[in-house]
Amino acid sequence: MVQASSHAEGGHEGKQGASRSVGLLVAAVGVVYGDIGTSPLYTLKEVFTGGYGVSVNHDGVLGILSLILWSLLWVVSFKYVMFILRADNQGEGGTMALTALARRATAAYPRLRTLMVICGLIGASLFYGDSMITPAVSVLSAVEGMGLAFDGIDHWVVPISLVVLVALFLVQQHGTEKIGKLFGPIMVTWFVALGALGVHGISQSPEVLKAFNPGWAVNFFVVHPGIGVAILGAVVLALTGAEALYADMGHFGRKPIARAWFILVLPALVLNYFGQGALLLQNPEAARNPFYLLAPGWALLPLVGLATMATVIASQAVISGAFSLTRQAIQLGYIPRMQIQHTSSDEQGQIYIGAVNWTLMVGVVLLVIGFGSSGALAAAYGVAVTGTMLMTTILVSAVMLLLWKWPPLLAVPILVGFLFVDGLFFAANVPKIVQGGAFPVLAGGVLYLLMSTWKRGKQILVERIDEGALPLPLFISSIRIQPPHRVEGTAVFLTARSDAVPHALLHNMLHNQVLHSQVVLLTVVSEDRPRVPEHERFEVEAYGDGFFRVLLHFGFMDEPDVPAALKLCHLDDLDFTPMRTTYFLSRETVIASRLEGMSRWRGNLFAFLLKNANGNLRFFNLPLNRVIELGTQVEI
């Protein structure tokens, strides 16, 4: 009986585990694969109608299909699924998480470490550009299908797209927790539809399956030496969204993402591309919109509706990714602090950042109005995608060689292969800068300038504040000689340096002539890892005479809740009773000068960013009625 019972329990647990695995796989399909899953809407259309000079004939179609297939296998299956997904930072992925890993890997090489930070900032900057282009091109390409169903509706494509996109951004502040549960099933339906359409097309012209032979891709370069590399600028559209596999790893883990790719997403994409190719072999004129023309007439309107939902989901994933990237960058010190609003009481990762949301919305609206069609926007798309991919490869190279300690004989050939292919795709997109690709370059350049100015400005600000700082032991010795009047309670002074006296403490002594019975010098340390366990959260050191030094460690995915963290500090003599604790903050006003370190115009830019950044009070969740801010002017 006991055996029967244990078998029953084991079977129940096994079913639960299987159910959870399927649930994670479906959820991953809904969040991770929206972008790459909607690429069939416009990729082959752009290849054959984008002015590349590719003929819609037997050799041209098979050559392009072979290029798309082997690009998917090399870049997504081999590079991202088998290698990049292994470069997790304690389970987290994405540009900032990888940059933090690369910083750790190059800690012993300052110049190389600086290069890794630059690559990370470039990758992050291009991702923000991509976050504007993806919603615009995806929704436009979906709505354009209506023009095939109704005559004379083409002039409504832009207004309808704008309504859909603006509505998407307006609902962000309310969260997408409830409707988010539908994303997975809708995207699974989308991929099943892609596969079914592909099978239907292939059945009409099975010879298209010859494109599985990579020889057709090689032959395309031989026959078309003039456009061979240039066409990669359109082929790369089939890879848009590959970076999402890595960026969303923290939500689902490597295995569900990999399984979803090989079980559902890759087969559906390949079938659909080959189905479109089969249609083009039969009807070259279908190149004007091979995706929608692949569908039977009765299925066109339902397909437009499903495609619109799929592109909205793809856009949602990119917007959420921008919020997540911003939070990580703030914690790592690359972006000024912003107000972060949690939109779910259950899911910590569901956040909303108003400044990012409205900036993205304005960018998307301008793109839709300015370009007017998915074909015109395709030129801008490739630059952002390939640039981000290239930066990811450079960052993971440092991790593989210096952190993982892979043997160079094994790692170098693989990395050279990645860099060669990424370099080809990026080079193919460089000429597109004059055709619309300038947008992500300019947007990325502005964001890089802001992030690098903020990072450098904060470093200089700390250096200026540290100049002439009074060492803490000397200060304690002086008050032993001339003890000030001390009042009951605990004073917490936030400071970047834990071994010197904060300016706020000196100002308090100067103006109020008193000192609290307990004085805590608190330094918040941002780690290059996503989360710090509670038992590693704090370090406490007692100096005597009521002085304590406390270090609080937070990861870039942690909520920096200082009062909650201080409750964990266990020391008999240290009391953090909320109503007896006062927090003293310094509020620096920066004055740009001709001092060495930063040009005057960048100094003014940093001063503007600092003035508009969220202060320590909100960022560290300090109680409003227990905070005193003391101002000081600093020249940089």
From Swiss-Prot:
Principal localisation: membrane
Membrane topology type: Multi-pass membrane protein
Signal peptide per UniProt: none
A GO molecular-function descriptor: potassium ion transmembrane transporter activity
Catalytic activity: K(+)(in) + H(+)(in) = K(+)(out) + H(+)(out)
Regions that span the bilayer: 22-42, 64-84, 115-135, 150-170, 182-202, 220-240, 261-281, 293-313, 351-371, 383-403, 408-428, 433-453
Record's subcellular location: Cell inner membrane
Keywords assigned by UniProt, alphabetized: Cell inner membrane, Cell membrane, Ion transport, Membrane, Potassium, Potassium transport, Symport, Transmembrane, Transmembrane helix, Transport
GO cellular component assignments: plasma membrane
InterPro entries referenced in this protein's UniProt entry, alphabetically: K+_transporter (IPR003855), K_trans_C (IPR053952), K_trans_N (IPR053951), Kup (IPR023051)
Function statement: Transport of potassium into the cell. Likely operates as a K(+):H(+) symporter.
HAMAP family: Kup
Protein family membership: Belongs to the HAK/KUP transporter (TC 2.A.72) family.
Protein name as it appears in the record: Probable potassium transport system protein Kup
Organism: Pseudomonas putida (strain ATCC 700007 / DSM 6899 / JCM 31910 / BCRC 17059 / LMG 24140 / F1)
Organism ancestry: Bacteria, Pseudomonadati, Pseudomonadota, Gammaproteobacteria, Pseudomonadales
